[in-house]
Design a protein with these regions (language model features):
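Thiamine diphosphate
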Residues: 99, 103, 110-127, 390, ...
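Active-site nucleophile and cofactor-binding loops and adjacent substrate-binding regions
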Residues: 25-29, 49-60, 75-81, 383-384, ...
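A short, small-residue-rich loop immediately preceding and capping a beta-strand
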Residues: 21-25, 46-50, 68-107, 275-283, ...
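Active-site diphosphate/adenylate-binding microenvironment
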Residues: 8-11, 29-34, 38, 341-427
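Structural signature of the thiamine diphosphate
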Residues: 22, 68-77, 83, 92-98, ...
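Phosphate/pyrophosphate-binding active-site segments
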Residues: 292-386, 495, 511-518, 522-555
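Glycine-rich, anion-gripping cofactor-binding loops and their flanking helix/strand elements
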Residues: 85, 209-214, 221-314, 396-428, ...
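Glycine-rich, acidic loop regions that bind phosphate or pyrophosphate groups
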Residues: 104-156, 245-348, 449, 474, ...
Length: 555
């Protein structure tokens, strides 16, 4: 057996022993030893192999799977720019705390500084975005390497998952030729792992920060983000605290859930009389400025739940950080909760009444219709930009829905691949809500070979022909209208149906509410539902909704 084959087989075997069950592979020559070892392991049922030809999409596919399962997923590529294309997904995994094991093949050292083809500097390619980096020694025809190879895989897995802060790790693996098996199975020593399929190195469960934050307010507010929404909702229900989520009503349940929280926090007269003494924040809020404003208020004590020591606090106003909320030291004020509930009902009614007068379709209206149509226990992947805001503002209460958002660095890239990855490991129907630019940015994520599985995923594309989010920001003010379309609106006129046809993905344009509802019925396989909206209406609609909510909510 040649050294590259031996090393690759051991690496794959130890990944399996470390509970890695999904691996995304990008084809190439230099990573051929790993490719063949992964194929054999998949054929034996030891792992599921997903093959993609676009490295950027492949890495985001792995992010989606790892985020949904909470377990490390490995992604493998050849040398050169292939490795560089993993970088956006590595950055997202870093900031979102997603366990990702990146394996990049490389030329051996004697070729890298000698003008060899397809060579870049892959050592520490991802900088500080990875929890751990190692360049493995080039495999050689000698004994004593099995323990080294297996030990390094255990180190990488532990850094990705086993310590306080989950995230990406990077192993750069130089391979010398020959890169394919030579027909011999002989080696200098046993290449077996520990008996019983155990890891080479058993590691302790490091857990999270060994501390609890201690709520001590009678008039407090729970702010839930990302994967902590359901747990935060349960805690709030148990202790009588109002709870607001960045996902609106998705994942929130119980009488203390405030589905209109994003609207209420933007009503100045309401917050003036309903400023909480403490905010118990779980996760990392990123969407709304009114949320950041509350967390920055020096009169509000912020207690943050975070499973690692890298806590988000742009305003530098966090008082405590811990792994969970302890029992509160004081009983909640029932009148405080009742006032939030009354305001929530008034805001929701104002939004419904205003939306009823709007011509179909709007992004906000589509978000609400989608949420109502989702089957029980569905997964909803929400794109950045307007969809993240539309879901929070118009989604409505659905405590049974699972939500995933790429809010680590909140980019629009890789969302199609992320959604496919998350749907691949979700046991149930899956949906995605994304904008047209997000869809176009990762349309190559639709490309799957005939041997690859396609999940049951409906991708809803809200097509406003450009950057609709900018109409809601400062750039969308009338004072900047002269250059808006060229540098912010960026209309494209792309034919999404023709694009989908090229990838052999079913596509439909929903032109009426009934067509939209029909298109959302659960169906097997991957499909795209497009709805075309007029982004020139965004700014005015949001202004009318803010005014309606402000008028309906008491101070």
């Amino acid at each position: 057996m040649n050294p590259s084959t031996a090393q690759a087989r051991v690496i794959v075997d130890e990944l399996v022993r470390n509970t890695v069950s999904h691996v995304v592979l990008c084809p190439g020559s230099r990573n051929a030893p790993l490719s063949l070892a992964l194929y054999d392991a998949a054929a034996e049922g030891k792992l599921r192999l997903h093959v993609r030809i676009d490295e950027r999409g492949a890495a985001f596919l792995a992010v989606g799977m790892a985020a949904r399962t909470g377990r490390p997923v490995a992604v493998v590529c050849t040398s050169g720019t292939a490795a560089a294309n993993f970088h956006p997904a590595v950055l997202e995994a870093d900031r979102a705390g997603v366990p990702l094991i990146v394996l990049t093949a490389d030329r051996p050292p004697e070729l890298r500084a000698a003008g060899a083809n397809q060579v870049i500097e892959q050592q520490r390619l991802y900088g500080g975005a990875v929890r751990y980096f190692d360049e493995m020694a080039v495999a050689e025809r000698r004994s004593g390497q099995n323990a080294y190879w297996r030990s390094q895989i255990c180190r990488a897995w532990n850094a990705a998952y086993g310590e306080w802060r989950c995230g990406p790790v990077h192993l750069n693996v130089p391979f010398r030729e020959p890169l394919v098996p030579d027909g011999s199975e002989d080696w200098f020593e046993s290449l077996e792992g520990r008996p019983g399929g155990a890891r080479w190195t058993e590691l302790p469960d490091f857990g999270a920060l060994p501390a609890f934050v201690v709520p001590s307010a009678r008039q407090g507010l729970v702010l839930a983000c990302d994967t902590g929404v359901r747990a935060a909702s349960e805690w709030a229900e148990q202790h009588g605290w109002p709870v607001v989520a960045e996902t609106g009503g998705l994942g929130l349940g119980g009488a203390t859930a405030i589905g209109s929280g994003a609207w209420l926090l933007a009503v100045e007269k309401f917050i003036a009389t309903h400023k909480p003494e403490q905010v118990l924040c779980i996760g990392r809020p990123t969407v709304f400025r009114q949320v950041q404003g509350l967390l920055a208020d020096p009169d509000v004590e912020v207690l943050l739940v975070r499973p690692d020591s890298d806590w988000p606090s742009p305003a530098h106003n966090v008082r405590q950080v811990g792994q969970w909320f302890d029992e509160p030291t004081k009983p909640a004020d029932p009148d405080w909760l009742a006032s939030w509930q009354a305001a929530d009902a008034a805001a929701a009614a104002a939004v419904r009444a205003t939306m009823a007068d709007e011509a179909w379709p709007t992004g906000l209206g589509l978000a609400g219709e989608l949420v109502r149509a989702l089957p029980p226990e569905a997964l909803l992947v929400v794109g950045s930009s307007n969809p993240a805001r539309d879901i929070a503002l118009a989604g409505g209460p659905r405590p049974d829905i699972l939500v995933h958002r790429n809010r680590g660095v909140a980019g629009i890239d890789g969302m199609v691949s992320t959604a496919i990855g998350a749907a691949t490991v979700h046991r149930g129907h899956s949906y995605a809500l994304i904008g047209d630019l997000t869809f176009l940015h990762d349309a190559n994520g639709l490309l799957t070979g005939p041997a690859e599985s396609r999940p049951d995923l409906t991708i809803v594309v809200v097509n406003d022909d450009g950057g609709g989010i900018f109409t809601l920001l400062e750039q969308g003010a009338p004072a900047h209208s002269a250059g808006f379309e060229r540098v912010f609106g960026t209309p494209h006129g792309a034919d999404l149906g023709a694009l989908c046809a090229g990838y052999r993905v079913p596509h439909v344009v929903a032109r009426t509410p009934s067509e939209f509802r029909e298109a959302l019925r659960p169906e097997p396989g991957l499909r795209v539902v497009e709805v075309r909206v007029d982004r020139s209406r965004h700014r005015g609609l949001h202004a009318r909704l803010r005014a309606a909510v402000s008028a309906a909510v008491p101070g």
